Amino acid sequence: MYRLRALTAATVGMVQLTRRHHTGAFRSYQRRRLMLAALAGVTGISASAGLMWTRAYAEAGSSVKHEEQMREEEPLKDVAEEAESDGALESSSGEDEDEAGSEEKKKKQRIGFRDRKVMEYENRIRAYSTPDKIFRYFATLKIINEHGDAEVYMTPQDFVRSITPNEKQPENLGLDQFMVKRYDGKDFWQKISQDREKFADEDSIFYTLGECGLISFSDYIFLTTVLSTPQRNFEIAFKMFDLNGDGEVDLEEFEQVQSIIRSQTSMGMRHRDRSTTGNTLKTGGCSSALTTYFFGADLKGKLTISSFLEFQRKLQHDVLKLEFERNDPVDGRITEKQFGGMLLAYSGVQSRKLKQMQKNLKRMFKDAQGITFEEVENFFTFLKNVNDVDTALSFYHMAGASIDKATMKQVARTVAKVELSDHVCDVVFALFDCDGNGELSNKEFIAIMKQRLMRGLEKPKDMGFTRLVRAMWKCAQDTAWDFAMPKQQ
């Protein structure tokens, strides 16, 4: 308050000084005194403003300093915890160890100011950057083979992180920053394969990506295309290139199907081959391991639409499994808040509203039993038919019937042939029951679930400026043509 009064007084003084200076009421020495006083006042105000800014900056950066201090103290804490755990092994029972482990899992490090800014930057990379830059930013492994040639790879965890908002890249890894592994002998690739992520399902799709389960740039484009394209689009594309009508396509026809589907996706439209970084699409749009998986070792086999749709289903299952495991399930269950986070990950909801929705979930289901992967998978199977679900719920709405939990379960049984548990319905209604009357907010639910199904990959990879310029140019052309060639009456 004192600073504001001083600023006001100095301003008034400057105004009066200006008026008197122009009227010539003061002599020259008095003018000099007033000028010196005004200069001193301005200097004081500038110093005060600088102190205020320094204080505000220090308060804003306190979370960063606190976070760095926490990171420096983490190794010491780990050593102390190891020493304590060694002593506990000698003096306590296995039950005490389980309790200590559960308490350790409950501790969650608070996200600091720096991490929030980094995650916002990474979200912009996911939303607006080219596939080449996204791949180079989120890939973590660079392998130099026996010939000295280097190639960048993603692990399955990197792939999930590259398409999931608010998932921070590990420290010291970023754009063109990788863990480098050089060829050092015959067992080199065996060591690489031993380091790959372990999956719950032995028939995971990622095991078809060569013996190491790593994802090249061509595989990255192919997998994102498969994830972002509805099943119906693939069915139509296969029928278009199935000239003899036997329901099968060969390798050449499949390359044409890929090219057409990829050109319709936002990721494919943004891609440009970049020889400087080595991120160019190989012939066929996918790796030799995937083409071997589809067409056999001699590449002379046939691929049916049913086989390809099964590949798409298994890929969606594996990515969903990785997303589930990233939440560190306890006894095979994740919390209701984590399940809500999975549903809202690609919603585009403002962060403040998102936090409030998650807080409501945590408060309402404080002592709940959690959600299993089977329940999560059933709900996402229900979401695969989201367009039919939208139609069914619209019928209920137009008929004047309320969309309650029983209605949702009936729609799931009718449309998707799955049974939703009562607990999952409770969580969904807690998120999307805006007015608390026990009825679903249909429009918001369907809009968010459509974005969740495509994982945000269907959104245009630009900020709208190029589309605006293109529309203005088209309008100008049409207007000029109409002016030059007026319509005859």
UniProtKB/Swiss-Prot annotation:
Domain EF-hand: residue ranges: 229-264, 371-386, 420-455
Where is this protein localized, as stated in its record? Answer: Mitochondrion intermembrane space; Mitochondrion inner membrane
Question: Which positions are annotated as binding Ca(2+) 2?
Answer: D433, D435, N437, E439, E444
What is a single cellular component term in the Gene Ontology annotation?
Answer: mitochondrial membrane
The annotated region (K/R-ring) lies at 133-136, 270-274
Q: Where is this region: C-helix region?
A: 467-477
Q: Where is the composition biased (Acidic residues)?
A: 81-101
Q: What protein family does this chain belong to? A: Belongs to the MICU1 family. MICU1 subfamily.
Q: What name is this protein filed under?
A: Calcium uptake protein 1, mitochondrial
- Gene transcribed to yield this protein: micu1
